[in-house]
């Protein structure tokens, strides 16, 4: 669950810290979290 903290909270600092991991692994996300990973973590966490 800790992996997806950035998904839940709109904290930009957390997003920046964890961005690279999520960008690399975004295709291997858990099914329930896939939407979050794709939309929020692609293209430099654009949604934040």
Curated annotation (Swiss-Prot):
Sorted UniProt keywords = Chromosome, Developmental protein, Differentiation, Disulfide bond, DNA condensation, DNA-binding, Nucleosome core, Nucleus, Spermatogenesis
Query: Which processes are annotated in GO (biological process)?
Result: chromosome condensation; sperm DNA condensation
Q: State if DNA-binding is listed as a keyword.
A: yes
| Tissue-wise expression | Testis.
Q: Which InterPro entries match?
A: Protamine_P1
* Family indicated by similarity: Belongs to the protamine P1 family.
User: How does this protein assemble?
Assistant: Cross-linked by interchain disulfide bonds around the DNA-helix.
**What is the recorded name of this protein?**
Sperm protamine P1
Q: Which organism is it from?
A: Cavia porcellus (Guinea pig)
